[in-house]
A protein has these predicted regions:
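Transmembrane-helix signature of polytopic, membrane-embedded enzymes
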Residues: 118-141
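Extracytoplasmic catalytic/substrate-binding loops of multi-pass membrane glycan-assembly enzymes
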Residues: 46-61, 72-88, 97-98, 300, ...
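Transmembrane-helix motifs of polytopic, lipid-linked glycan transferases
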Residues: 11-17, 105-126, 329-333
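Membrane-interface helix-loop-helix junctions at transmembrane boundaries of multi-pass membrane enzymes
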Residues: 18-19, 124, 175-185, 223-227, ...
Length: 415
């Protein structure tokens, strides 16, 4: 724990280098990390081999992977189920020993790093230091961010990759004075992260691919920079390669999709994909989208398995849901401002949010806690839009610009 706390401080000072107030922000981040450590001990109060749902399942698989690695099985031949996150945890178990507490502490560490990179993204977008710090602090202390990122679940890594990819993308777009080699290194790293995100959650390739395509296309049309075109081409090539390799290979084993796995071959896979599409078309799309954005409703919160029977946790989640509804309303104005401003980066980020939400609304089971967990991935991107002031300031500027002409017209009539 002390090692992770030290690393948290070091990374915080590096990301927020030369930024005012970085000392107390890092202190708050350390507090957020400690809160997660405490929560780990709470959720494992009944033992690490009996607590949790998906987290317990991944823990059991990771132990088997550790045995494979220790017996000499090469990493690329390791047998795993559900998600590549179990392999990452298995590697940790193989090196340091089976310790679910340690695995959860690492997840908590990556969760806090996500808060740093989110704050850095806000600063690079030109937000004020105060606003950027507020976004990061809110993200660090949102209850769902604590709940879903401290167990041995894959959510912590997914949230981290989402924020890191968009952070690095913004850096490539904004830092025009970088050397070509440094820009290429960032682009190659982003492409690698796209592949890793696909291994963690199979459809992430397309949510990222769509968002980055919109972002980079409009950025290229606006700036005509050759490196942006190279970046766009690299993303498209990565999406094609990963689609025909990783996605195609793992589609049949993707546990969130209902498939007949007794058959093999491309023709049967095509039939299964057609079945999935038919299932999507049979859904009430408006109701599914509404469920993804708004569930769990306040009356459904007590029935979430992870917090059922815990009055304090139920109250906290209800408060969070009310704040989430407010955040969505406020974000509408931020989104309208982004559309008026026509900023390529914000448009791409918005495309990512929309595509991720739509995919999950259509393929996720209509269960409140499932929507609650999957929706947590778009909390960080949406926080970057959660400000009504720029929109109304823009409207005010437009009115002020038009008023002199109107006043001049009135005077001419009077004369």
């Amino acid at each position: 724990m002390l090692t992770l706390m030290a690393l948290t401080a070091i990374v915080g000072f590096l990301i927020l280098k030369n930024k005012p107030g970085r000392w107390w922000f890092v202190a708050i981040a350390e507090l957020a990390l400690i809160c997660r450590f405490i929560f780990v001990f709470v959720i494992y109060a009944n033992g690490t081999e009996y607590s949790g749902t998906d987290g317990l399942l991944y823990h059991q698989i990771a132990k088997d992977i550790a045995i494979q690695l220790q017996s000499g099985t090469p990493l690329w031949k390791v047998r795993y189920e559900y998600t590549w996150y179990t392999v990452l945890t298995g590697i940790q178990y193989a090196i340091f020993g089976v310790n679910r507490y340690a695995a959860s502490f690492v997840n908590a560490f990556f969760s806090v790093l996500s808060g740093y990179f989110l704050t850095g993204t806000a600063l690079n977008l030109g937000f004020s230091v105060k606003k950027s710090r507020l976004i990061g602090i809110v993200y660090l202390f949102i209850p769902s961010m604590i709940v879903w990122t401290t167990d041995t679940r894959k959510e912590s890594m997914i949230f981290f990759l989402i924020i890191l990819i968009w952070y690095m993308t913004l850096r490539v777009i904004r830092q025009r004075d970088w050397s070509i080699s440094r820009q290429c290194l960032y682009i190659l790293t982003i492409c690698l992260l796209l592949w890793l995100s696909t291994l963690l959650r199979i459809y992430m390739l397309y949510t990222f691919g769509g968002g980055l395509f919109i972002c980079l296309l409009f950025c290229f049309l606006k700036t005509k920079r050759n490196m942006i075109f190279v970046f766009l081409s690299a993303v498209l090539i990565t999406c094609c390669i990963v689609s025909f390799t990783t996605v195609r290979h793992n589609m049949r084993d993707y546990h969130a999709l209902t498939m007949d796995r007794s058959t093999e071959g491309d023709e049967n896979l095509d039939e299964e994909i057609d079945s999935i599409l038919n299932t999507i078309m049979s859904k009430n799309i408006p109701n599914s989208i509404n469920g993804f954005l708004t569930k769990p409703h306040l009356e459904e919160v007590p029935f979430i398995p992870d917090i059922a029977g815990n009055p304090f946790a139920i109250t906290v989640v209800r408060i969070e849901m009310i704040l989430w509804y407010i955040c969505m309303i406020v974000s509408v104005f931020g989104i309208m401002y982004a559309l008026i401003k026509w900023d390529p980066y914000l448009l791409g980020l918005l495309a990512f949010i929309v595509s991720y939400g739509l995919i999950n609304a259509l393929i996720s089971e209509n269960v409140a806690d499932t929507y609650y967990r999957y929706r947590a991935a778009i909390v960080a991107p949406l926080l970057l839009f959660a400000d009504y002031r720029p929109f109304f300031a823009k409207i005010k500027d437009l009115l002020m610009t038009a008023s002199p002409d109107a006043k001049s017209g009135d005077n001419s009539i009077m004369l």
